[in-house]
């Protein structure tokens, strides 16, 4: 997974850009976690638990985007996708799935999170 961290020095805001297949991961990190290091620590703990119990699924539910951890696989998806599959919306109103869901390996995801944590703690400097 390719990503780049950015800090807007005028506004003090942090952002992440991910490759096209993982845009939802970047949105999740910015919108659901942001600069909240306690949330970030909670997610990292959840990933550790999933590694210890690979047959079990662990879910972190955000306001708009959620995270599913199962063993070495991480799935990030918009909550609207779960609603959509339950309620079979018309095709014209269906979300473009490739921008609304992404999967990646545990190692790549943990690397993203730990580098984001360092970026935030060092105020946008590595």
Curated annotation (Swiss-Prot):
<protein>
    <recommendedName>
        <fullName>UPF0231 protein VC_0605</fullName>
    </recommendedName>
</protein>
<comment type="similarity">
    <text>Belongs to the UPF0231 family.</text>
</comment>
<dbReference type="InterPro" id="IPR008249">
    <property type="entry name" value="UPF0231"/>
</dbReference>
<dbReference type="Pfam" id="PF06062">
    <property type="entry name" value="UPF0231"/>
</dbReference>
